[in-house]
Amino acid sequence: EAGRDQVPLLERIKFLSIYSSNLDEFYRVRMPVLMALDTLTTDKENEKAYRTAKVEINRQQHEFGRVLSEDILPELLKQKIHWIYKEEMPSKLKEETGKVFFNEILAVLHPVRIDIEEKVFFAQNNKLYQVVILEDQQGKERIELVNVPSDVLPRFYHFQADGLRYVVFLDDIIKQHLEHLFPKDKITGVFNVKITRDAELRLEEELDAMLKKIFGE
């Protein structure tokens, strides 16, 4: 429905939101079961079900991104609404986003260092985070986990500039101003992640899986 031109624009956006919410629920409820069956049994049908689900989800995610990027965002721009999505934040917004960062966001950010050797990992379930790769003045690298407080703050912020209304993700505002959270360090990488935890998964396994995805190992 979100990809149909005949559907009103606002309704198409709502359909994308519903899909995203349903996918979260599927990952919390169904995927752990499929993963467990794939791991614990030798039944080829169970293995096929898990892999089929992964392929279908990847296909749907690709289509989600295509519809949003190629259909929804251009239509919004025609109405002078610029939704910042997978692009650099315009520098002209930095002053306004900075006010929001210091007045609303900074106080509820709680960076936590990830101790890879000790497998210390305190991420909460079903929460958004930014994994920040830092390098100190001696060139030593470390990883910090920064919460994206969408449970207490709006997920989107609106700004006016040059006759356009900009729609900006909360996480993009945080990313733009991370230098104030880590003033003595060089930021070499920022990755958005969402933790959807299977109760049976050990935390050290979860940490290993996340780091492998980030570093491509």
Give, region by region, the residue ranges found by the protein language model.
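N-terminal non-catalytic structural scaffold regions of very large proteins
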Residues: 1-217
